Amino acid sequence: MDSEERRFKLLDTLLDYSKGTLWWVHNRLWKEQFAGFVWKKNSDFHPGLSICRRDVEGIYNTVPMLLGTSKRLHGRHVLSVRHMSPEWSSHHDRPSYFSVLRPCPLRLDYFGRKDTITQNVTKPRLESDEMRVLDKMLSGKEV
């Protein structure tokens, strides 16, 4: 078993990257995926929401994510998630908005590295009511 295969088995065992898990994704990765992404100088990470519905089979497979933003999004297919930042943060009570218009495939190899993708320890997963809204969004139903 080579080192990449061992790393994959370790990541697959330790990390829950299933639908509804919340992450902090380095802006460099978002910029690589979205040409119009604006990287603010005082912010290195943006929230990510996994919409992965299947098991990842290898280290170079991808986990589909939705990009979160503090800019209010309007529309019928928008999820608002609160309390993603620590309580001491000025962003704690501000919602992050997710839209299904921009899913982004991120390689499993990036997960668990503090300079690329880290799990949101403040809020690792959507709450049940938020999960219901996400399911409606992904099925194309009005939220």
Question: Which role fits each region the language model picked out?
Answer:
Residues 37-89:
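Compact nucleic-acid interaction/catalytic patches
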Residues 1-5, 76-143:
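C-terminal terminal-subdomain/extension
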Residues 19-21, 61, 96:
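A generic secondary-structure signal marking the coil-to-beta-strand transition
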Residues 1-42:
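GIY-YIG nuclease catalytic motif and its immediate N-terminal context
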